[in-house]
Amino acid sequence: VQIPDSAKELSNICNGCVNLKEVHIPSAAQKMNSSFFGCTALESITGEIPSSCTDSGNLFSGCKFLSGTLTGSCTSRTTLSSSFSDAATAGTGLTIILRYDAEKSQETANTGFYGGTKSADEILNALKASMEATFSSGSHITITTNADKTEG
């Protein structure tokens, strides 16, 4: 599926597309709630979850064959907690790299989901913990955080 990089609203765009094998995440994406929910054949994701994305519930839920590496650019307003529930339960596994976006976080430092002003490490660790809490027991997902980040 070719989605233009300028696309912002992707909620439910391919929800339940059981034959979808690969997808590119647009760099302008903001709302991605249930975009690829139930895409059971989805294996490959290109692009990254941009820091502009603040709505991503059930983004890849039920995508059991996800594999490779996906980067998520994170701010204090990022929530990915239910984005990967029941995902990557088959196949070779998925690695998610959480990268802190200090520039975008400065805009929302006191209004973020993680309780106001927090360090990059605190935000990334809280985000990682909230994501891992929603993985199914059979998920082959590894989350790492990018240590090369700057604080504002």
Label the model's feature ranges:
Residues 105-116:
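Short, flexible/disordered intra-domain loops and linkers
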